[in-house]
UniProtKB/Swiss-Prot annotation:
Gene name for this UniProt entry: Efemp1
CDD domains the record matches: EGF_CA
One example GO MF annotation: epidermal growth factor receptor binding
Pfam family, one: EGF_CA
Protein name as annotated: EGF-containing fibulin-like extracellular matrix protein 1
Species per Swiss-Prot/TrEMBL record: Rattus norvegicus (Rat)
Amino acid sequence: MLQTVFLTMLTLALVKSQVTEETITYTQCTDGYEWDPVRQQCKDIDECDIVPDACKGGMKCVNHYGGYLCLPKTAQIIVNNEQPQQETPAAEASSGAATGTIAARSMATSGVIPGGGFIASATAVAGPEVQTGRNNFVIRRNPADPQRIPSNPSHRIQCAAGYEQSEHNVCQDIDECTSGTHNCRLDQVCINLRGSFTCHCLPGYQKRGEQCVDIDECSVPPYCHQGCVNTPGSFYCQCNPGFQLAANNYTCVDINECDASNQCAQQCYNILGSFICQCNQGYELSSDRLNCEDIDECRTSSYLCQYQCVNEPGKFSCMCPQGYQVVRSRTCQDINECETTNECREDEMCWNYHGGFRCYPQNPCQDPYVLTSENRCVCPVSNTMCRDVPQSIVYKYMNIRSDRSVPSDIFQIQATTIYANTINTFRIKSGNENGEFYLRQTSPVSAMLVLVKSLTGPREHIVGLEMLTVSSIGTFRTSSVLRLTIIVGPFSF
C-alpha cells in the first residue's frame, strides 16, 4: 500500500514539474541586431550605413557587432580576431550580461565617445572589445551571440531606450516623430531613426548649435550669373537692367528691346544689355533719347538755298522767286520768258532780264530819225532838222544783277565806221547824274563803260553814250549816240 502511495506522489511531482517548466523560443534580437530568418540567428546591423550623420565633429564611423564607433579620421584600426570571453548561452539568456565593453546607439550609457557612439555600462549588450592607446584602436571582430528576446507572451521583457514592447511581446522602435515625443523645434524636421530620432533643418537652413539658421547662398559664389538676393531659406537670381533670367533661373541673357518692346520712334539698334535709338535723315533724337524731332535745316544755315529755304518734316526744300526756277535743288535760274510765254505785242520786242522781261518797241526811232536797221535810227542829211542833232542813235539793252560788285566793266562802245584823218572821243552824255558810271577809252575807236557804284534793283537805268568824230584837218564834225537801257534785276542772282 505504501509503495502504491509513493508511486502516486512521485508521478504527481513529475507532472507538476513539467507543468511549471516554461518553454522559451527566440525570434527577436537585442538592439543592434536583427533576426535573420534564413540562418535562424541574429545578425549585426550596420549603423554607419543607415544612420544619417552617425558621427559628428569630423569623426569617422566604424561599424562593429551590436553597435558602432566614432573615431578620429587619423585613427589606425587593428582588427584582432581573438574570441573574447563569453558567458554561457543560458547565462546570456537569463541575465543579458556580456563581457564586451562597447554598446551602440542610444542605450543607457555611462560615457560618450566624442563625435557620436557610446561606451556601455555593465548591463550593455555583448559586442567586440575595443582597446585604445593614443591614436591606435584594437577591435576584436569575433562577436558574442546577441541577446535574444523570449517570444513567450507571458514573459515581460525589458526594452532598450527608444523601444517599447509591442502586443506581440517584441521590442519595436518608438516613432518619436509621429508620437510627438521628440524635442525638435518648429523650424526643424523630425526624422525617426531606429531607437532614436534626429532633427534636421528645412532646406535652405543649416544647424548652428541647436538652432537652424539661414544659409546665405549668395555668399558662396557662383550661384547666380549677375545678381543674387538671399531670402529666408532660399535665394533668387536677378539680372542687371537690359538682361533677363534664362530658363535655368541662373544665367542672364540679353533682352532684345528692339524685338520685344521697341520704344524707339524710328530706328532701334540692340546692344548688349541695352539699346540705342537713331533717327532717319532729317531728324534728331529728343531729350528722352527715344523720340525723334525734325531738324530745322533752314535755321542751322543760311547758305542752304540761294533764295528761300522751306523746312519740311525730315527734310527741306528751296524756293525761288517769280521769274526763276530751282536747279540742282538749291540754286535759282532765270526763266527766259521771251522764249516761252510773254505778253509783248507784235510791234514790240521781248527783252529778258534776271527775274522778268520787258517789252520794247521794235521801231524806237522818233522823228526826224528813220529806222535803217535793227534798233538803229539815222537822221537824213537832207532834212534840215538834222543839222544840229546826232547823225545816228543806236538803241541797246542790257541787264545786270542787283548789287553787282564794283568797279565792273559792263558795256563796250565801238565805232562802226572809221574815217581817215579823224579823231574819236567818247563821253557820257546823260544818265550819270549820281556818278554811277565811268567811261574809259580803250582805243581810238572804242571805249568801256565802267560801273563804279552798285545798283540795287529792280530798276531801269538809261545811259546816253556819245562818240564825237572830228576831222584832223577841220573839214567836218559828226556825232553818234548809243542809248543804253540797263535793267537791274531784283536779286543778286
